[in-house]
Amino acid sequence: MKNKYYPLRSSIDELSTKNDNEIDLEKGPLPEYNSEDGSTLPPYSENLKLKDPKQMGANNPNLFNTDESTTPPDYGEDSLSHRENHSSGTTDNSSPFLIKLLISFIPIFVLNVPAVCYLTYKDALFKDYGKDEWVYFGMWCASCLMIFISLWCFYETWTQAVAQCVKVTAISLAKCVKVISIGLFNIRREMMIIIWILWLIICCILFVYIKSGDLNLNKALIYSTCTISAVLLLIVSSVCIPFWTFERTLAKLAKVFLLQSGIVLVLNGTMFLRGKHFEWTGCEIEASVLFIMGNVLFLCEMECPGALRRMPKSIRNGIASFLGGIANAIRGANDNNDIPLGEMDVESEV
């Protein structure tokens, strides 16, 4: 019986025909395969001529290597049963009994805490209970027990729902905070000016009430008005100021506070050494001046970093320029006085 070869080309044959450079050096170039008459077999297919499957690996001893080192390991019954048990890929993710019990009890506890606190505040916890009160208490306990059993039975469902709700809420709040912070960052300069003006108005109203006697405050509080204003301005404007400049803001506020403290110490120390003290009007003037000066310096330092550091140099330059102008004026007057009388007569005739 003749062997029939059907015109079928495998993917391996197609790959070998495409790769012209892959030639076996021992057997030479690949012969052409004529699938119609079957006279030429596929390349390197001498094993297909063998009818006995045992003789298929005679020409190629490496085809069926029975070396023990390459044989697969012998899997015992324990390993096979272990593989069968974990073949589905499912693991036991159920929570322990006590944890489920505790988490299911937390909502009941949170629900009862306000009621217990309210009854304790009213001094009506288990006091003067009549029939109706005990019936209500029993119904409440039964309702709590049913809710607890429901939470324990449907633990997986409601915990997943709560976790998803918390996740969605957190993402939404984060987006809202991001949008608000970006909006405030874009208008931070205008917001700082508005906040400063509003706080200035509030302090002016406070001073008016103190002056009229409707509000009695200690002098120490009036002295510290400048510090309070700076701190409140920092707290409110910290929303408008980017977080990465918060350290710089604290540094500028510390400089302003030190400057204000120095002025207060110098003024009060001078008055104390002279045996005098500020009257009520003097305290108001001092507090108002320190308040306005502190806020103006703080805003200038925030808008123009290094203003306080450059202030002594600017003051020295200003004083030097002023003195230089006076010196030039005096020198010019002296030069005019040194002109000879003959030259003055010639100039007058001309």
From Swiss-Prot:
Single Gene Ontology BP annotation: meiotic drive
Organism domain of life: Eukaryota
The entry's keywords: Cytoplasm, Endoplasmic reticulum, Membrane, Toxin, Transmembrane, Transmembrane helix, Vacuole
Signal peptide per UniProt: none
Region entry Disordered, spans: 1-92
Bias type Polar residues, positions: 57-72
InterPro entries per the UniProt record, alphabetical: WTF (IPR004982)
Membrane-traversing stretches: 97-117, 134-154, 165-185, 190-210, 226-246, 253-273, 280-300
GO cellular component assignments: ascus epiplasm; cytoplasm; endoplasmic reticulum membrane; vacuolar membrane
UniProt entry tagged with the keyword Ubl conjugation: no
Composition-biased stretches (Basic and acidic residues): 11-29
Subunit structure comment from the entry: Homomer. Forms protein aggregates. The two isoforms can interact with each other and with themselves. High sequence similarity is required for their interaction.
Similarity annotation: Belongs to the WTF family.
Task performed by this protein: Promotes unequal transmission of alleles from the parental zygote to progeny spores by acting as poison/antidote system where the poison and antidote proteins are produced from the same locus; the poison component is trans-acting and targets all spores within an ascus whereas the antidote component is spore-specific, leading to poisoning of all progeny that do not inherit the allele.
Name of this chain's protein: Meiotic driver wtf30
Protein species of origin: Schizosaccharomyces kambucha (Fission yeast)
